[in-house]
Curated annotation (Swiss-Prot):
NCBIfam families: transcriptional regulator NrdR
GO molecular function: ATP binding; DNA binding; zinc ion binding
Protein name per Swiss-Prot or TrEMBL: Transcriptional repressor NrdR
Residue intervals of the ATP-cone domain: 49-139
InterPro entries: ATP-cone_dom, NrdR-like_N, RNR_NrdR-like
Gene name of the encoded protein: nrdR
CC cofactor: Zn(2+)
Length: 157
């Protein structure tokens, strides 16, 4: 690692610790030439993911865009910001584990809905109404039907 003060490439690591909730390593270093101390961060390089939109246009996956959509859907529900962050983290992990370079916006939306379904019906409906472009009350009713318990199961119990 090159020293920012003298550009010497010899340094020693004084301290290493996990940073950014385990997604990076923070290292405190000291230059062996001028004794200047500096901090470096080491992260796993991830493959950028491209989102293919309905219009067939492509854009780079934006964590903040997904996070903002979830925050809007979860407003005034019992879902806190930490849980919303963990949903976005989980979706990013799934995309990386699948080694996907491209994902359709519809697949991404279904991943979000899958995470929301067990958490909050209100947040699910809000997100679905934007993502699925609801045009009227029938779209809401149709989606709400998925939350009704199975009638066969209800009669058995």
């Amino acid at each position: 690692m090159q020293c920012p003060s003298c550009q010497n490439t010899d340094s020693r690591v004084l301290e290493s610790r996990s940073a950014d909730t385990g997604k990076s390593v923070r290292r405190r270093r000291e230059c062996l030439n001028c004794d200047f101390r500096f901090t470096t961060y080491e992260r796993v390089e991830t493959v950028p993911i491209t989102v293919i939109k309905r219009s067939e246009s492509k854009e780079t996956f934006s964590r903040s865009k997904l996070l903002n959509g979830l925050i809007r859907a979860c407003e005034k529900t019992c879902i806190d910001n930490q849980k919303i962050e963990s949903i976005v983290d989980e979706i990013e992990i799934q995309l990386q584990q699948r080694n996907m370079k491209e994902v359709s916006s519809s697949d991404l939306g279904e991943m979000v809905l899958g995470q929301l379904k067990g958490l909050s019906e209100v947040a699910y409906i809000r997100f679905a109404s934007v993502y699925r472009q609801f045009n009227g009350i029938n779209d809401f009713v149709e989606t709400l039907e998925t939350f009704k318990p199975d009638k066969k199961l209800a009669t058995v119990i």
